[in-house]
């Protein structure tokens, strides 16, 4: 895990950063439905898991722009940008109705990511611990699949004043609408390092990456 320190005075969002870390600490979140029809069909055609395919594309999108890889070292009050960020996914245990966090390293190579993500999930199924280790995994973002509901809105709250810059992404069950499969995706980012454009851009990039991925013959 490596990062670079960002000069807050030279940071291109310095004014916004100052306002939303000193005067009005808050986050910004959005829920929108995206068309996953082609990605679902691709997953079925290649006999791969839709969930892992989506997680890969989400991780690729968030690693494509520095704005989504920001962090804050509260001990030294330094703004930083990680070289890469990795998803924390979750395994749900039906018998106990609890979740276990799963750390999965992001690899740009799809096959390597897919293989490791599947292995990580299988390993997590053997434990019942909620073993988040944020001290040793600071460059990780939350990626949670809410498989029981195709919801319309979701908001994740954090304590006032807590400068949590890692993206928090949730998505729900897809459902058919007018012949297409639509899936709700919620994006939460700290307002100090992201605005409406950057939140909306996650959806735009996801749609682009899904289109390219679904057209290729990889993954099977």
Segments predicted by a language model, with ranges:
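Acyl activation and transfer enzymes in specialized metabolism, enriched
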Residues: 39-64, 183-202
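Hydrophobic/aromatic-rich structural module bridging two neighboring secondary-structure elements via a short loop
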Residues: 63-103
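Short amphipathic alpha-helices and their capping loops
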Residues: 1-23, 83-92, 156
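Histidine-centered acyl-transfer/condensation active-site motif
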Residues: 135-148, 167-204
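Acyl-group handling in specialized metabolite and lipid biosynthesis
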Residues: 28-32, 39-46, 97-111, 194
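Gly/Ser/Thr-rich phosphate-binding loops and adjoining beta-strand/alpha-helix segments
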Residues: 3-6, 21-53, 69-85, 140-143, ...
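Glycine-rich active-site loop/lid that clamps phosphate-bearing ligands
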Residues: 146-168
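Helical lid/core segments from catalytic subdomains that handle acyl or acyl-like groups
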Residues: 93-151
